Amino acid sequence: MSAMDVMIHSSSFLLPCDETSTGTRYALVVLNQSLPRFTPLLWEHAKLRLCADGGANRIYDELPLFFPNEDALAIRNRYKPDVIKGDMDSIRRDVLDFYINLGTKVIDESHDQDTTDLDKCILYIRHSTLNQETSGLQILATGALGGRFDHEAGNLNVLYRYPDTRIVLLSDDCLIQLLPKTHRHEIHIQSSLEGPHCGLIPIGTPSAKTTTSGLQWDLSNTEMRFGGLISTSNLVKEEKITVESDSDLLWTISIKKTGLSIQDHTP
């Protein structure tokens, strides 16, 4: 085993806050795609909540649907983003005015067409006091997957632009995060909430050798590249997965449809 530092990964943000014992602090970015059913849980975990442009429409329109027995206005007042940031080409005027009246900070970056809205939000979080106060910051991004593929590719590119920042892209079906080649990785599986399907994907550069443990089909100094072998439709077999590679890899794992109750995990 090499002398690489070990990076620990856990989807503890899918657990109720009172069951989370890690020292991780979370920031949440909501992008302009359908909200995962567990968005209220992520919101409760987060210390900083941002909407990327049209993501504010999703919070305004879709969150009340998760609570059909509660007043929609009360839900909108409860789930107020701290910041709305982006090029402001997607957010509706009525939504923008609503959150401005609630005191949400709005940052218009329509002058910057060279970065994605997710990129803009990541930069804000990296420069925030939350990031300066803790070394255990993790950024959760909903709505980063699904919809147009070029948008998805842009969001995946953000993972590679900030390899020293822990970013997790989330949809209703799965999560994706970067495993930097600078570390050996231990992934602790929340088996009641995620898996068993998973994958390790080299995007950008091939991997000459990747070694894993804890998977149905483990890799042993295996070469992976597009046009050759990539590890998709693999299965987790253990509660802890280890990964070591000479290349940055994307780790993805399915999120189960059961075991995540909105009512159980919200204030």
Curated annotation (Swiss-Prot):
Name listed for the protein in its UniProt record: Thiamine pyrophosphokinase 1
Assigned keywords, A-Z: ATP-binding, Cytoplasm, Kinase, Nucleotide-binding, Transferase
Matches recorded under Gene3D superfamilies: Thiamin pyrophosphokinase, catalytic domain (3.40.50.10240), Thiamin pyrophosphokinase, thiamin-binding domain (2.60.120.320)
Encoding gene per record: TPK1
GO term, biological process aspect, one: thiamine diphosphate biosynthetic process
This enzyme's EC code(s): 2.7.6.2
A matching Pfam family: TPK_catalytic
Disruption phenotype: No visible phenotype under normal growth conditions. Tpk1 and tpk2 double mutants exhibit a seedling lethal phenotype.
UniProt-listed InterPro entries: Thi_PPkinase, Thiamin_pyrophosphokinase_euk, Thiamin_PyroPKinase_B1-bd, TPK_B1-bd_sf, TPK_catalytic, TPK_catalytic_sf
Cited function: Catalyzes the phosphorylation of thiamine to thiamine pyrophosphate (TPP). TPP is an active cofactor for enzymes involved in glycolysis and energy production. Plant leaves require high levels of TPP for photosynthesis and carbohydrate metabolism.
